[in-house]
Every structure is written in structure tokens, then in C-alpha cells.
Amino acid sequence: MMAEKPENSLEKETGRLEAFSDGVFAVAITLLVIDLKVPTLKGPVTSQQLAEQLFSQWPSYVAFLISFATILIMWVNHHNMFKLVHKSDTTFLFANGFLLLLVTAVPFPTALVSEYLTSSAAVIACVVYCGLFAIINIAYNLLWWSAVNHHLLKPNVSHFIIRARTRSYLLGFPSYLLALVIAFWSPFVSITICALLWIFWSIASYEKTPMRLHQQDE
């Protein structure tokens, strides 16, 4: 029987953890759709009435799209991070669990924004929304920190990519904190910043700096 390649054996050690994480991301992103409700109108309903009711629910659509895109990008970044990791330890497992805990909470502030974005309570709804994503960014940095400082990365990952990833992950917290502060004056601007951030992260995920992995001897 042919000997198993070292790369394959390294990947198997984190395979279960990544599969479990993928399942949590999938559930969280699916739960977002629950807040999209079909309008209930009594009596004979005209197309105009239905259209007006559908349009009046625009905060729900905005919150759904932003949250869906954000969770999707979080999953992409999580997947990209695990491409660099070849083993785990207890700290890494708990850091990943903390991140997943926060990811499953995303539908709650999304529902708050959907319900109260056009009301006088919009400030609190947006503060909670931005605050959660700021904490999620802290969780991402903890996960990355544990991978780097506990020597869980693949041996051929260069210092260049480590520094590039670290800078990228550190950008999130001050950005969401800024959106949180702005929410006290303009909830709509705050939500706009969140939308711009997921656009930025999606572009950044495509423009990742080359990994510059050194080829291992076969």
C-alpha cells in the first residue's frame, strides 16, 4: 500500500473542525431568511396594496442582504484561514467555538434592524448590530492569534502572508467600532458603512496577497 502524502495527513487533523464550522455557518446563514415575512392583508387585496406592503418591508431586505453577505464573507475568510492551519490545540478549539457562538447570534441583531430601522429605536438596533460584528472581529483575531502563536500553521507559510493576514484582520474592529459610534447620530449611515465593509472584505478576499509558500521536498 502506497504511503500517504504528508500534506494529506496534515489536512485531516483539522478536517472535522472545519466541517463542524461549515455546518454552523450554514445554519446561521439559513436562519436569516426567517425574518423575511409574507405580508398579511385582510379582505380582497389588489396588486398595488401588496406591492406597497412589500416595499414597506425594505429594512428587512437590507438587513438580510448585509447579514447574508457578511456571514458568507466570514465563511470565506474562515475557509482561507484553515488552508494555512494544519493542526489544532485546545486554545484554538475554544477560540473557534467562540467565533461560532457569535456567528449564530447574527440573526438576532438582523431582526432588530429589520424591525426598528425606520423607528425612533433605530439607534439601539444599529448599535447592537455593529457591536456584534465588532466582537466577531475580535473573535477572528483571537483565532488567528492562537494559530500563529501556538505554531499551528503549516511549516511552509511565510512571514509575509502572516503579516498580511494580521493587518487584514485588524482592520475590522476599528471599522465596525466607527460604524457603532456613528449609529448614535445616523443609523442609516452606520448601516451603509456595514454594507461598504462587506464589499471591501469581498474584494479583499479576491485580492489576497500571494501566499509565497515554499515548496516542500517530495
Name every feature range the model reports, one short phrase each.
Residues 2-218:
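Multi-pass alpha-helical transmembrane bundle typical of ion/small-solute transporters
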